[in-house]
Amino acid sequence: MEDYIIDFLIKFQKLIAKNVKIQHLGIENVKRICGTDIAYKGNIGYAVAVKEEEGKIEYNLVKGDVFFPYIPTFLFVREAPLMIKAVEKYECDLILVDGHGLTHPRKSGIATVIGVLLDKPTIGVAKSRLTGDLVVENNITYVILHGEKLGVKVGKYFFSIGNKTDLSDVIDLAKKGYPKVLKLADKLSKDLKKKE
């Protein structure tokens, strides 16, 4: 990848990070929760958004070409366009994104990028740690980056602030385990990929 493209993407991520709003949402107030994930077959991406409202499940599948290679810390370029297209169909009080939020070297993981671009509350839920130190306090494993608590690890999952949420929201969500809407989005995206 050309240096000037990487430089441009870093500038974009820094701008996203400057526009993050950390504010309390209140998980108990969330009536419409959405989750988004993506699977790949070659250069084709299969993104799914799952919405749950009062026990009713809806989902939207979006398929498209993926033009950008996988480069760690720049996942958003590859995945966010299709994820946004999938999730934009729904009005969501909270969007859960398969990936990191502020627990990213430039505080600009895919959950943060999607949250800022859509001006929506987001939380990132990732299956591996990208950056930050793990510190246990009062039986909670925090992910700390530059002295700031930005997420938590529960089981094998890493939950982090995306946008328009705060650490207490992240903790409250994480206590419920791996979110159902993300489980479904993961399954549906993989099922769609297999059918093609």
From Swiss-Prot:
One example of a Gene Ontology biological process annotation: DNA repair
Reactions catalysed, as given in the entry: Endonucleolytic cleavage at apurinic or apyrimidinic sites to products with a 5'-phosphate
Top-rank lineage group of the source organism: Archaea
Cofactor(s) this protein cannot do without: Mg(2+)
Localization per Swiss-Prot or TrEMBL: Cytoplasm
Keywords: Cytoplasm, DNA damage, DNA repair, Endonuclease, Hydrolase, Magnesium, Metal-binding, Nuclease
Gene3D superfamilies with a match to the protein in the record: archaeoglobus fulgidus dsm 4304 superfamily
Entry EC number(s): 3.1.21.7
InterPro entries in the cross-refs: Endonuclease-V
Annotated site, Interaction with target DNA, chain positions: Y70
UniProt entry tagged with the keyword Nuclease: yes
Positions with a binding annotation for Mg(2+): D37, D98
Listed GO CC annotations: cytoplasm
Tagged with keyword Kinase: no
MF GO annotations: deoxyribonuclease V activity; magnesium ion binding; RNA endonuclease activity, producing 5'-phosphomonoesters; single-stranded RNA binding
UniProt cross-references to CDD domains, sorted A to Z: Endonuclease_V
Chain's role: DNA repair enzyme involved in the repair of deaminated bases. Selectively cleaves double-stranded DNA at the second phosphodiester bond 3' to a deoxyinosine leaving behind the intact lesion on the nicked DNA.
Entry similarity comment: Belongs to the endonuclease V family.
Protein name: Endonuclease V
Gene: nfi
